[in-house]
Amino acid sequence: MIDNATLILGPPGCGKTYTLIERVQAKLEEGVHPSRIGVVSFTTKAIGEFVARACDKFNLTKQDFPHFKTLHATGYHGLGLAPKDVMSKQDYAKLGEMLAVDFDGADSTSIHDGVAMPSMKGSGAKYLQIIMRSVYRMSDLDFEFNYEEDHDLSFSKLVQIEKQLLEYKSKTNRVDFSDMIAKYIDIA
């Protein structure tokens, strides 16, 4: 757990944003500068809604709250990454050629945090999801494979893709979205 951090989880409409706004207000009333307050969420939609409500309530701008970001944007900016450092559609296409799987999709840039996220489809997408989930959860690959319960997938292919992905990222000095979070946590 991070010192001075609070984790707020819940389904849509349960008051997460309201609770966070109240906490931000309390900190501002204590004299904490807005640039010293961070709110992190999984989605750009949630952060966009939060920033809009916070700016409206406190009569401030988005620039006043530089640490209201998605998890990935926090890692991306915290690590000082540039677009060239991140696995792109072209990188996944090269990797797919090496592995004889498809990582189809397009790069889509978030308007809220400027991070380009490849949306994956194709025969390799499920494998990448399992690999990334293993990193996020800090769990073994075999656990995540079994958890998926997809009998159309091959564990040996999963291991091959993970190994090739790690090698490719190492040789090209690229990171993927799971790396952004994991590496940022390592230095934080």
Task: Tell me the role of every PLM-derived stretch.
Residues M1-D85:
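P-loop NTPase Walker
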Residues G78, Q90-D91, D179:
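Solvent-exposed, flexible loop/coil residues
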